[in-house]
């Protein structure tokens, strides 16, 4: 895991978030508070603006600072949740600091991603099936781990992870929400995709597409 890749991924994520403004906003207006896109864009923009300052730092410090910035820049529930994801990945690198700059295997990257997702789950006290971003993140993480364990190529892994994220997003359409404003809608939320899940699907696809272009 290299700092340059983390920062390139952050730029790709910001560009993808901006490109999907209408999609995310329409979903949030339907079942959310209507401010999810603004908050996510603010966070991704803030991270993109830290590029030069973060470039000299080691990966674990970059991920930690990204988490801290998201915590302060993003309002609502998304800020602490996304911050915990990046802080979790930073913690993974800190716990494996003897190879923080040598995290090169697909299995190691999958383990880092999974640690971040688990940290987010603990922070949000939520799980799959509750119409949240976890309905995208968990299957993407599980797919990443399984594909890496099977020795698949980076290209194969990225394609499978993208597919898992897409399916996870679609899965939220038929769910009743148990978190946030959407929970108050009960069965009226059925038929709508979760905006947080959509944002995560956009982010995952952006990073995978960045890798596939290399």
Features from the language model and the residues they span:
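N-terminal loops that bind phosphate or other acidic moieties
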Residues: 1-214
């Amino acid at each position: 895991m290299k700092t340059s890749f983390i920062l390139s991924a952050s730029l790709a994520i910001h560009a993808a978030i901006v490109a999907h403004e209408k999609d995310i906003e329409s979903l949030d207006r339907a079942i959310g508070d209507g401010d999810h896109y603004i908050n996510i864009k603010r966070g991704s923009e803030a991270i993109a603006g830290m590029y030069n300052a973060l470039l000299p730092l080691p990966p674990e410090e970059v991920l930690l600072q990204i988490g801290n910035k998201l915590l302060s820049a993003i309002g609502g529930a998304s800020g602490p949740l996304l911050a915990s994801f990046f802080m979790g990945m930073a913690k993974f690198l800190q716990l494996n600091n003897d190879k923080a700059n040598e995290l090169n295997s697909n299995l190691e990257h999958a383990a880092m991603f999974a640690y971040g997702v688990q940290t987010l789950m603990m922070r949000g006290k939520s799980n799959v099936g509750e119409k949240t971003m976890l309905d995208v993140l968990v299957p993407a993480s599980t797919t990443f781990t399984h594909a890496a364990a099977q020795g698949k190529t980076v290209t194969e892994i990225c394609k499978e992870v993208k597919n898992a994220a897409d399916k996870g997003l679609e899965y939220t359409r038929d769910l009743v929400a148990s978190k946030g404003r959407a929970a108050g809608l009960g069965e009226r939320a059925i038929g709508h995709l979760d905006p947080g899940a959509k944002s995560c699907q956009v982010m995952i696809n952006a990073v995978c597409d960045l890798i596939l272009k290399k």
